[in-house]
């Protein structure tokens, strides 16, 4: 019986990122922030606090012909991250993210005694995680202007023949709320058998199979402060001058998503050991990494929803309705309304699957004074999960990148020159 507990606490500053300049050589010449290269130039303090508790109990029973073990684990995490998310001296936006996590796991393994010709192991694994994340994003005045107001005005036609349109946002700050519950449940049963001295002495074969089930879900509640904005449209010929003030555009996302995954993961291996410490081997196995949700995307989704609702507010305004040109204005506005937000498509990423192949050798040479390990591997991955920056350029998200192949070789050599060295 083993019982382990450990606790960690930290409260510190964080995220000392600095500006490295433009990537393109031509753009470097016109870089307006040259004086900030190599400098940390935040205007908001960044910090990180964490409280972490881990506990585990390991129980093992050894019978005459088998070993039974059970491992129970528990983890509690509470943290807070405050981040100047634009990483510059500008007053654009910041993030305060708090997490509270509780995880419990159990694994029971029933296996044979070592040294037997048939070595086997059968087990079951269960895991449940509760995770609540609060991550409101605060857009300050400069962020409201550059990331919402300017983007909205960029969508308006810029032609002498088209009406002149302008949108002005009156909010000094804009708070985009974010509250997320993302629990996950996982369970697995598995068996692996190794047959030693199969057909000839030194040849062993391993066959394993794991049935894995996982359920992930996300309950989201992102309610943002409504945008207060003014809008005007004007033309010289024919004369047209319409405007409305203090219109409102909300952004609200409330809902729940869930996904279930059931996978069979086989494993096959052959090894031939002709002398102790000298062997060749080959393995084939299927790998799996579960999918999940990008809660960081909700600030991007809120910006799109704001633009949609601002355009709808303009379209429904009685002050911007003209008897002669109303149909033309409505048609123009319809062409500038972004597509409706699909929360599931925008925030979900799929599981990653792979087939893994490896062959190699372990060699003991020169009367056990030289050891060499050689290996070659190949991985065929589908729906590979990769990290990328979000569309607004701030924060990272996980996406699926289709398929990829990885291959390579490794070599390691160790030597004992003398008995003491």
Language-model segments: residues:
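Transmembrane beta-barrel architecture of outer-membrane proteins
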Residues: 50-54, 58, 101-109, 184-190, ...
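Solvent-exposed loop segments that connect transmembrane elements
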Residues: 15-40, 86-94, 136-177, 217-258, ...
């Amino acid at each position: 019986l083993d019982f382990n507990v450990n606790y960690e606490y930290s409260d510190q500053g964080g995220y000392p990122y600095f500006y490295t300049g433009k990537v393109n050589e031509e753009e470097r010449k016109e870089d307006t922030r040259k004086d900030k290269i190599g400098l940390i130039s935040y205007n908001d303090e960044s910090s990180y606090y964490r409280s972490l508790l881990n506990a585990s109990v390991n129980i093992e029973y050894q019978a005459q012909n088998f070993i039974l073990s059970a491992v129970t684990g528990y983890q509690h995490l509470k943290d807070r991250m405050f981040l100047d998310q634009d990483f510059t001296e500008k007053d654009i936006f910041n993030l305060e993210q708090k997490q509270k996590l509780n995880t419990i796991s159990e694994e029971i393994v029933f296996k044979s005694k070592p040294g037997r010709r048939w070595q086997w192991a059968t087990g079951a694994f269960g895991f449940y995680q509760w995770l609540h994340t609060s991550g409101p994003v605060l857009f300050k005045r400069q962020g409201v202007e550059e990331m919402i107001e300017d983007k909205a005005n960029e969508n308006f036609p810029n032609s002498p023949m088209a009406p002149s349109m302008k949108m002005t946002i009156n909010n000094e700050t804009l708070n985009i709320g974010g509250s997320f519950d993302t629990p996950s449940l996982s369970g697995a049963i598995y068996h692996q058998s190794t047959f030693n001295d199969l057909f000839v002495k030194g040849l062993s074969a391993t066959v394993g199979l794991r049935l894995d089930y996982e359920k992930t879900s996300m309950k989201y509640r992102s309610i943002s402060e409504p945008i207060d904005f003014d809008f005007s449209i004007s033309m010289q010929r024919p004369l047209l001058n319409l405007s409305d003030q203090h219109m409102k555009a909300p952004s609200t996302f409330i809902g729940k998503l869930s996904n279930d995954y059931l996978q069979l993961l086989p494993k096959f291996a052959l090894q031939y050991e002709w002398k102790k410490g000298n062997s060749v081997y080959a393995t084939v196995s299927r790998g799996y990494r579960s999918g999940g949700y990008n809660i960081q995307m909700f600030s991007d989704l809120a910006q799109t929803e704001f633009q949609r609702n601002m355009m709808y507010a303009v379209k429904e305004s009685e002050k911007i309705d003209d008897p002669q040109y109303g149909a033309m204005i409505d048609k123009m506005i319809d062409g500038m309304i972004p597509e409706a937000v699909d929360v599931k498509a925008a925030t979900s990423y799929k599981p990653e699957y792979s087939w893994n192949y490896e062959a190699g050798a372990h060699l003991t040479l020169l009367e056990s004074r030289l050891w060499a390990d050689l290996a070659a591997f190949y991985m065929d991955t589908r729906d590979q999960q990769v990290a990328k920056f979000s569309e607004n350029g701030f924060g990272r998200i996980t996406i699926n990148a289709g398929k990829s192949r990885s291959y390579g070789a490794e070599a390691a050599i160790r030597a004992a020159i003398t008995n003491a060295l």
